[in-house]
């Protein structure tokens, strides 16, 4: 990539701009010195200035209700444009395909994509010779928790995951919890050898099985934002790793990192840890 491209602020489309995460992304992109808000897409308040909607003052960027119209315009720009998607599991797959089709680089924080959908998007990005980033969690603290869990798994055979989120989250278990279990499974170890013949008096009482026989328990309550515990057990001891999100600003360093790096990639990568 040329020095001119690297020195020019990165133009960013935010899809789901009025959502809880989208609002924070708009603010972060607006405030960062090397990024510039190109467009804001949402189904609500179409035509209203996104800056006024978020209390940032007039930005002269009206909220668009059509991602396709925005991508058509972005395809005409001299420098590649990045799209950040924090929308809904039912919308994100087509959003990413559309972005790639128009040469817009996707950064995705929306969870709920199936493994098959992720594989299809990876193939689509490969054919376009474009980079894309999908990360179930953009918190650097969560990446560190997963790294600590990988290390701990060398010494513990029993582990379960509890993830807790606000009650507006549509998918369960969370993409972060699934990714945590998958990263532990990639060690080639099967956890939680059975000790007794279990029976559930209420279906699902013991959680859901993820990779490597790791159970995940999901909690949805108002007052929560995003929290995860990885609990290891052994005779005479419990080892608990926990990450708590108290403000969605914690995700912004990771989002900005992905925005800055995605145009340098030639394939889809899954997980923020691959950029660190």
Curated annotation (Swiss-Prot):
Catalytic function, reaction form: (S)-2,3,4,5-tetrahydrodipicolinate + NAD(+) + H2O = (2S,4S)-4-hydroxy-2,3,4,5-tetrahydrodipicolinate + NADH + H(+); (S)-2,3,4,5-tetrahydrodipicolinate + NADP(+) + H2O = (2S,4S)-4-hydroxy-2,3,4,5-tetrahydrodipicolinate + NADPH + H(+)
InterPro entries hit by this protein: DapB_C, DapB_N, DapB_N_CS, DHDPR_bac, NAD(P)-bd_dom_sf
Gene Ontology BP term (one): diaminopimelate biosynthetic process
Keywords, in A-Z order: Amino-acid biosynthesis, Cytoplasm, Diaminopimelate biosynthesis, Lysine biosynthesis, NAD, NADP, Oxidoreductase
Gene3D superfamilies (alphabetical): Dihydrodipicolinate Reductase, domain 2 (3.30.360.10), NAD(P)-binding Rossmann-like Domain (3.40.50.720)
Catalytic residues as annotated in Swiss-Prot or TrEMBL: 165, 169
Pfam families assigned to the protein according to its UniProt record, in alphabetical order: DapB_C, DapB_N
Gene Ontology cellular-component annotations: cytosol
Primary localization class, coarse: cytoplasm
Binding site for NAD(+): 16-21, 109-111, 135-138
Annotated (S)-2,3,4,5-tetrahydrodipicolinate binding sites: 166, 175-176
Example of a GO MF term: NADP binding
Coiled coil residues, start to end: none
PANTHER family: 4-HYDROXY-TETRAHYDRODIPICOLINATE REDUCTASE 1, CHLOROPLASTIC-RELATED, DIHYDRODIPICOLINATE REDUCTASE
Sequence similarity: Belongs to the DapB family.
HAMAP family listed in its UniProt record: DapB
Reported function: Catalyzes the conversion of 4-hydroxy-tetrahydrodipicolinate (HTPA) to tetrahydrodipicolinate.
Protein name listed in UniProt: 4-hydroxy-tetrahydrodipicolinate reductase
Provenance organism: Thermosynechococcus vestitus (strain NIES-2133 / IAM M-273 / BP-1)
Gene for this chain: dapB
């Amino acid at each position: 990539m040329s020095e001119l491209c690297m020195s020019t602020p990165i133009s960013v489309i935010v899809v789901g701009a009025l959502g809880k995460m989208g609002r924070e992304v708009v603010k972060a992109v607006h405030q960062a010195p090397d990024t510039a808000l190109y467009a804001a897409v949402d189904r609500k308040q179409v035509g209203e200035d996104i800056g006024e909607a978020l209390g940032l003052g007039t930005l002269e960027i009206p909220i668009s209700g059509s991602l396709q119209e925005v991508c058509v315009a972005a395809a005409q720009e001299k420098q590649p444009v990045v799209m950040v998607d924090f929308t809904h599991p039912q919308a994100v797959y087509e959003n990413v395909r559309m972005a790639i089709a128009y040469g817009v680089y996707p950064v995705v924080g929306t969870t709920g994509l199936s493994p098959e959908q992720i594989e299809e998007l990876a193939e689509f990005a490969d054919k376009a010779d474009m980079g894309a980033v999908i990360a179930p969690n953009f918190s650097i603290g969560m990446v560190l928790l997963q790294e600590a869990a990988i290390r701990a798994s060398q010494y513990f055979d029993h582990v379960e995951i509890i993830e807790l989120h606000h009650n507006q989250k549509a998918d369960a278990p969370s993409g972060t919890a699934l990714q945590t279990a998958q990263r532990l499974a990639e060690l080639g170890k099967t956890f939680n050898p059975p000790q007794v013949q279990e029976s559930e008096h209420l279906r699902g009482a013991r959680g859901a099985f993820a990779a490597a026989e790791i159970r995940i328990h999901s909690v949805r309550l108002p007052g929560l934002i995003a929290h995860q515990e990885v609990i290891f057990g052994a005779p005479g001891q419990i080892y608990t790793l926990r990450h708590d999100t108290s403000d969605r600003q914690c995700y912004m360093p990771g989002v900005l990192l992905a925005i800055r790096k995605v145009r340098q990639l030639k394939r889809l990568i899954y997980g923020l840890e691959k950029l660190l």
